[in-house]
Every structure is written in C-alpha cells, then in structure tokens.
Amino acid sequence: MKIHIIARGRIGRSPEGELVERYMKRLSWPYRITELPDRASNAPLPPAPPHSITVAMDEKGKTWRSMEFAQKIGNWQDEGRSEIRFLIGAADGLREEERAAADMYFAFGAATWPHMLARAMLAEQLWRASAILSGHPYHREG
C-alpha cells in the first residue's frame, strides 16, 4: 500500500516543509507527494490507480481520533488498497473536481488550518498511525 499526498501549492524550504519531510521519512509505507500548481491552475489530479481510496482534507469532513485514523488505515491496508490518496487544496480550499474525486472527507477538527500546516499535520498523523499499527510507543492516549 502506498500513501500519496496530493496538494496544491509548493511548500518549498519552510518550517512546515521540514516537518513534512521529517515525519514522512519515518513512515513504514512507501509514499509519494505530488505538488500541483495553486488554485489558479487547471492542472488536473493524477489519475487514481485501481483499488485506491481518495480522502479529501476538508474542514467539513469527519473528525477521527488518532486511534480511529490508524484503524482506518489498517483496515484499508488489510483490504489490499493499492494507494491511499490524501487531497489538500490551496489556500482557498478544494476545487469542485477535487471534492468530486473524494471517496470521503477528513478534518482536523472544526477549525480552519493553513493548507501548508495541514500537510505537516497530516504527515504527523500518518507517522502516528504507522506507530500505532506497529506497536511503537510514540502514541499515548488517555
């Protein structure tokens, strides 16, 4: 199973970019990050491979505790999903065609987060899910 983050805008060399890199390097799954031009561009999403799932990061999405997020990923892995795609929009959010491509929506709570920070938060949650599923002591709940 591959993790694929598809995001609008270039994160470049920034504190958020460093966090994304730090957490993604720790993942046990292979991963790919695709940066698309920002909202002004008509660049389409890369095609979804067969048996993949697409999760749009959106403030109106479902919120999952870290354990629930890990269980979702574990279930998708057990189902033999080829790729889990996470879509992160530009500063103004997701485009209509990006929303339409999503199988589900996930939110980091009710607050609105900057899109570059959302990437870092997603990278951390992916690492946390990997740690939970492997029994690593990184996650402490309670």
Curated annotation (Swiss-Prot):
Binding locations of S-adenosyl-L-methionine: G89
GO molecular function, one term: rRNA (pseudouridine-N3-)-methyltransferase activity
EC number of this enzyme: 2.1.1.177
GO cellular component, as recorded: cytoplasm
Subcellular location: Cytoplasm
Keyword Transferase: yes
Keywords annotated in UniProt: Cytoplasm, Methyltransferase, rRNA processing, S-adenosyl-L-methionine, Transferase
Keyword Transferase: yes
Catalytic activity line of the entry: pseudouridine(1915) in 23S rRNA + S-adenosyl-L-methionine = N(3)-methylpseudouridine(1915) in 23S rRNA + S-adenosyl-L-homocysteine + H(+)
Record Pfam families: SPOUT_MTase
Oligomeric and partner information: Homodimer.
Function: Specifically methylates the pseudouridine at position 1915 (m3Psi1915) in 23S rRNA.
Recorded family membership: Belongs to the RNA methyltransferase RlmH family.
Identification of the protein by name: Ribosomal RNA large subunit methyltransferase H
Organism, as annotated: Zymomonas mobilis subsp. mobilis (strain ATCC 31821 / ZM4 / CP4)
